[in-house]
Curated annotation (Swiss-Prot):
Disordered, as annotated region: 1-58
Species for this entry: Solibacter usitatus (strain Ellin6076)
Domain of life: Bacteria
Keywords tagged on the record: Ribonucleoprotein, Ribosomal protein, RNA-binding, rRNA-binding
Gene name for this UniProt entry: rplO
SUPFAM superfamilies: Ribosomal proteins L15p and L18e (SSF52080)
UniProt name for this protein: Large ribosomal subunit protein uL15
Length: 150
């Protein structure tokens, strides 16, 4: 028995339907499209999601939610990642250089995930409550920049 001699089980591989290649093929003349009608000619293509007249799925399901055009997107930094890096002062520029964030978007937010054991100074637009607590407990400072006034 060779690898080159192995064949798939009988009936597993279906032969390709060669459409419009003569009457002897069984799929010549109208090429399985029937005679006349909207779908018989060239250029026919069904719309995406068309289900033969049945109410399509995207219309059967209810509308839900909306896109908030005022949503702000923040670049997120966790305290655990700051802990692993050398240095005691982290500004937005240093975070960009170190690769902690790729882009500032609408600001930088520091979250409290991770353990902080040393004193650090962090500069960001927003801080979570847990991040503020952990920074202050470690004896560090959190400087909020560009605080919006309403």
């Amino acid at each position: 028995m060779n690898l080159s001699g192995i064949k798939p089980p009988k009936g597993q591989v279906k032969t390709k339907k060669r459409i419009g290649r003569g009457m002897g093929s069984g799929h010549g003349k109208t090429a399985t499209r029937g005679s006349k009608g909207q779908h018989a000619g060239t250029g026919f293509s069904q719309k995406r999601g068309f289900e033969g007249g049945q109410m399509p799925l995207h219309r059967r399901l209810p509308k839900r939610g909306f896109k908030n055009i005022f949503k702000k997107q923040f670049a997120i930094v966790n305290l655990g990642r700051l802990e692993k890096l050398e240095g005691n002062s982290f500004t937005i520029d240093t975070m960009l250089q170190l690769g902690l964030i790729n882009k500032v978007y609408d600001g930088v937010k520091v979250l409290g995930t991770g353990v902080l054991t040393r004193k650090i100074t962090v500069e960001a637009h927003h801080f979570s409550k847990s991040a503020l607590e952990k920074i202050q407990q470690a004896g560090g400072t959190a400087q909020m920049i560009g605080a919006e006034t309403k």
